[in-house]
């Protein structure tokens, strides 16, 4: 159970750093007018919290234990819908930058760099924590479906903490709902793909395009609106497949337990 304590403690400490950092920024009124100062502050907080996760990984984990095992290339077909969403978003985003780059000042360019760094660090950290450390630890100890549910809910509930970053309660709840849809789709994807790298890349690029385009006033493809419906469809299909496979697995001490053969058969 020690590894489970480590993963849970790591998530809690990560979140506490983010919350305390956001509260400090709010107390100094950093988030009110100066957007660049806000981005710099957020980047520092993110670097500290993610630096802690890197420390934990180096001390306690191997890459395969946090979701970076050999990817199942034949299962990438399940990830294709997300690629179809990302490509037009990325195209419109790059097109918008190209058309407006002559109007960008140094502040905007620095902001883009900070947003990119922040979204890369946050995207990979969140995937490693919930679809890497927590999911991989739990699925070896409890019912696989229970492990998936805990990982999904943990990821979504974590986003309520955005209220400490200046979001209203309604905005935070909307964020939780959107994160829930993504979480319940990405957990079975992580299991089927046997690797979280595609998920972390999508997570990073999605956040970067959404945040950067809003900051720069660039219109992106409306195809992003299909993400939630796709999350729902992928969730229903993959959860159904895994649950059916789980029912066929073996019982041990009257409790259905995780089986490598089960995962490999999906």
Language-model segments: residues:
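Structural signal for the C-terminal ends of transmembrane alpha-helices
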Residues: 55-63, 91-94, 237-247
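Aromatic-anchored segments of alpha-helical transmembrane domains
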Residues: 15-24, 85-93, 152-161, 204-214
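Alpha-helical transmembrane segments in multi-pass membrane proteins
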Residues: 10-59, 74-79, 113-114, 118, ...
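Juxtamembrane helix-loop-helix connectors linking adjacent transmembrane helices
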Residues: 30-40, 61-128, 135, 140, ...
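Hydrophobic alpha-helical transmembrane segments
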Residues: 8-12, 77-79, 112-113, 145-150, ...
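Functionally important transmembrane alpha-helices
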Residues: 171-229
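C-terminal membrane module of polytopic membrane proteins
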Residues: 204-266
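Membrane-interface helix/loop boundary segments of multi-pass membrane proteins
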Residues: 12, 125-152, 191-195
């Amino acid at each position: 159970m020690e590894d489970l304590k480590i993963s849970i403690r790591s998530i809690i400490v990560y979140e506490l750093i983010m919350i305390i950092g956001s509260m400090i920024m709010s107390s100094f009124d950093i988030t009110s007018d100066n957007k660049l100062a806000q981005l710099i502050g957020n980047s520092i907080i993110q670097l500290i919290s993610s630096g802690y996760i890197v420390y934990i990984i180096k001390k306690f984990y191997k890459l395969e234990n946090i979701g970076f095992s050999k990817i199942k290339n034949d299962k990438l077909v399940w990830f294709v819908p997300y690629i179809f969403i990302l490509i037009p978003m990325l195209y419109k985003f790059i097109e918008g930058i190209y058309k407006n780059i002559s109007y960008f000042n140094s502040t905007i360019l620095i902001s883009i760099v900070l947003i990119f760094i922040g979204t890369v660090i946050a995207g990979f950290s969140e995937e490693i924590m919930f679809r890497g450390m927590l999911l991989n630890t739990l699925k070896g100890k409890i019912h696989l479906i229970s492990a998936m549910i805990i990982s999904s809910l943990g990821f979504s509930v974590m986003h309520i903490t955005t209220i400490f970053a200046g979001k209203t309660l309604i905005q935070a709840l909307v964020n939780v709902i959107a994160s829930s849809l993504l979480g319940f789709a990405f957990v079975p994807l992580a299991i089927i793909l046997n690797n979280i790298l595609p998920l972390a890349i999508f997570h990073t690029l999605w956040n970067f395009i959404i945040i950067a385009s809003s900051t720069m006033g660039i219109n992106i493809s409306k195809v992003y609106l299909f993400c939630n419906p796709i999350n729902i469809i992928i969730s229903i299909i993959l959860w159904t497949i895994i649950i059916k496979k789980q029912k066929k697995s073996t019982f041990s001490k009257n409790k259905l337990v995780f089986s490598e053969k089960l995962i490999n058969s999906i």
